[in-house]
A protein has these predicted regions:
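Conserved core segment of the aminotransferase class I/II
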Residues: 28-99, 109-112, 194, 208
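Conserved glycine-rich beta-strand-loop-beta hairpin in the small C-terminal domain of fold type I
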Residues: 83, 99-109, 119-132, 166-168
Length: 218
């Protein structure tokens, strides 16, 4: 009697082509939620939707009632933005986005990991969660405040995401670059090397350098 609610907002930004929704294994019991803000690079432009099977029609009707009594409709500017986003085939856009994010994410991973920083290789999206191995700070929030003060790099503490505050985890976004300019200069499937990243995402490289120096100094 279990119903699965699967948040797949980042599914289009998976770096490998083997992503498979859980709905393909249990379609009659799965509700998929997704939207355009992540794949479209439109943070703050919130337009999402549910994919609900006919077998869960009763839940669909309840969601419709709840939505209509809560927010009625998406704001007009976001609706027009969504028309633009979905009116044409966006596969080339997605492929370029994934290519860029994979290259930049791997650069951050390869250059930040050390015996002072634990970090997993990126599998999709545009975030990493490094753990800084030090006992200088009482909380991840205190650590992030010090990183911002010492390096100018802004990170969110792991405690903001439910991790214990005494674990020195921080969420890092590697998107401080002009995505449209980057995309305009590459081809689908192009190999993105260091020189290309340095040309279009110099702030990311600078930020990683500052974080690495900081981690080695504490």
């Amino acid at each position: 009697n279990l119903i699965i609610l699967s948040d797949e907002i980042y599914s289009d930004l998976s770096f490998e082509d083997n992503y498979k929704s859980i709905s393909s294994f249990c379609p009659e019991k799965t509700i998929v939620s997704t939207g355009l803000s992540k794949w479209c690079g439109a943070g703050g432009w919130r337009l999402g939707y549910f994919i609900i099977p006919d077998s869960l029609k009763e839940i669909k009707n309840m969601i419709n009632v709840l939505a209509s009594e809560t927010f009625s409709a998406v704001s007009a500017p976001i609706q027009y933005a969504a028309i633009k986003a979905y009116e044409n085939d966006y596969s080339d856009y997605i492929n370029k986005s994934r290519n860029i994010l994979k290259a930049v994410g791997n650069y951050v991973y390869e250059n930040l990991r050390s015996n002072k920083v634990l970090i997993n290789s990126p599998q999709g999206g545009f975030y990493l969660m490094p753990e800084f191995l030090n006992k200088k700070f009482n909380s991840s929030s205190q650590m992030c405040d010090n990183i911002l003060k010492d390096t100018g790099v802004a990170l969110l503490p792991g405690s903001d995401f439910g991790f214990e505050k005494n674990r020195m985890l921080a969420r890092l976004s590697f998107t401080d670059f002009d995505g449209q300019k980057f995309m305009d200069q590459i081809k689908v499937g192009q190999i993105i090397d260091y020189n290309t990243i340095n040309e279009f995402a110099p702030k990311v490289i600078e930020g990683v350098d500052e974080l690495k120096k900081w981690s080695e100094s504490i």
